[in-house]
Design a protein with these regions (language model features):
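Short beta-strand His + acidic residue motifs that chelate non-heme Fe in jelly-roll/DSBH
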Residues: 102-105, 171-178
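Short conserved micro-motifs at the rims of enzyme active sites and ligand-binding pockets
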Residues: 27-29, 176, 196-199
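Beta-strand secondary-structure signal
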Residues: 17, 113-115, 184-186
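Catalytic core of non-heme Fe(II) oxygenases with the double-stranded beta-helix
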Residues: 94-164, 191-203
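A short alpha/beta connector and helix-capping loop motif
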Residues: 179-189
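Active-site region of the double-stranded beta-helix
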Residues: 58-90, 97-112, 118-123
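Non-heme Fe(II)/2-oxoglutarate
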Residues: 1-81, 203-208
Length: 208
């Protein structure tokens, strides 16, 4: 008998990936360089003092690209029935020198979070995501890792890469390897409008 078997992944965690597919403009580069000199120590690396970087006029092109990614996430993943507008709340730049790292964390008070990589070495730089429930009742040593048996998963990242993911998803950056100063633009996304349903006693009007 020649049987065929299929595997379905129920309730998966979405990670949306894209790339801006262009070089940074002179104004954008000037913006990144400015914040590099105006930052403070974070847990393992440094973060821009400005927590609303994407509000700058020089970031208009970045906002347009990121907005397309957010809309794709909303249309394909969330699929809201009611009119809801998703918008960027805060945005900041992270700078990670060789030997530094970015601590394990999530993003509270946010629905979608994302990272746009400004300066990243694809051979060395990565983002690591962690499974929400890492408890394993029985732990088997694996011959190979896949989406079903892994407690964490990483993606190599390079210049212009964009990652969007649920804000509740735990992530971190290991100790930086390579020679470049890794620069990434992180942001949070929330919603305004009508969510839930009156007949289900879940109606809520979110206003900015």
């Amino acid at each position: 008998m020649n049987s065929q078997f299929t595997i379905d992944g129920l309730f998966p965690t979405p990670i949306i990936s894209s790339n801006i597919n262009r070089s940074w403009t002179e104004k954008e580069l000037a913006l990144f360089d400015y914040h590099k000199d105006h930052c403070h120590n974070n847990m393992g690396n440094t973060t821009s003092n400005d927590r609303y970087v994407l509000n700058a006029p020089e970031a208009k092109g970045l906002v347009g690209f990121i907005g397309q990614g957010i809309q794709h996430y909303v249309d394909k993943i969330i699929c809201p029935k009611n009119p809801v507008e998703f918008y960027i709340t805060q945005s900041w730049l992270n700078y990670t020198k060789p030997g530094e790292y970015h601590h394990t964390h999530e993003h509270p008070n946010s629905i979608i979070s994302g990272v746009l990589y400004i300066d990243a070495d694809r051979d060395h730089d990565k983002i690591i995501f962690h499974k929400a429930n890492r408890y394993q009742q029985i732990k088997f040593p694996q011959t190979e890792f896949n989406y079903f048996n892994s407690e964490s998963w990483f993606f190599n990242v390079g210049n212009g890469d964009l990652k969007l993911f649920p804000s509740s998803l735990t992530h971190n950056v290991e100790q930086k390897k390579g020679d470049n100063v890794r620069c990434s633009l992180a942001f949070n996304v929330f919603a305004k409008g009508y969510i839930g349903a009156e007949e289900e006693l879940t109606a809520l009007h979110l206003r900015m």
